[in-house]
Amino acid sequence: MKIPFYNRRSFLRTASYGVAGLGLMAGGVPAMAQSFAPTQTMRGGSNNYRPNAPLVDRLGSGFQMSGIVRRAGTGEPLEGVRIQIWAATTLGGEREPRNHGSVLTQADGSYSLEMEQIVPNFGQPHAHLAYDDDDFETVFLRPVMPSASDTSLQADFNLAPA
C-alpha cells in the first residue's frame, strides 16, 4: 500500500480547494456577479451643485463626458435617467452656469455630453456628476482625470432603489 506524501504546500493547496468549495455551496457568489454594487457618493462630489440643472445637448466642444447607468444588484441598464454634469472648464469655474447641464440616459443606459475642455480646479482636473431624482438613492461623483490633457472621462453609476 502506497502512503500519500503531504508537505505543507500540498496540504495548504488541498485545504484551500475545500474552503473555496464550501463557500460556493453556502451560497457564495463569484466576484463577477458582485460587480453591480451600489455606487457610493464621493467626498466633495456635491460641491457647487445646482438642483434641476437644465437638459442640454452640449456644453461646448473638445471634451466628452460619458458613462453607463445601471440598476444596482442586477446590472440592468436604466433608460431615461437624468444625470447632472458640471466642471471647471475653459469657460470658467464650476459655478459658471454655462458649465452646468443634465442629460438623459439611452435605452442601453449610456449617457454622454460634449463640453469644453475640463481644467484643473484646486490642482486636480475633475468633473462632478449627480443623480438626485426620487426613484433611486442620490449619488454624487467627483472623478479625477489622470491628466489635464485628457479629452474624455467616463463615470458609471449603479443606482440602488430609494
Region locations from a protein language model:
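N-terminal secretory signal peptides
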Residues: 1-10, 19-25
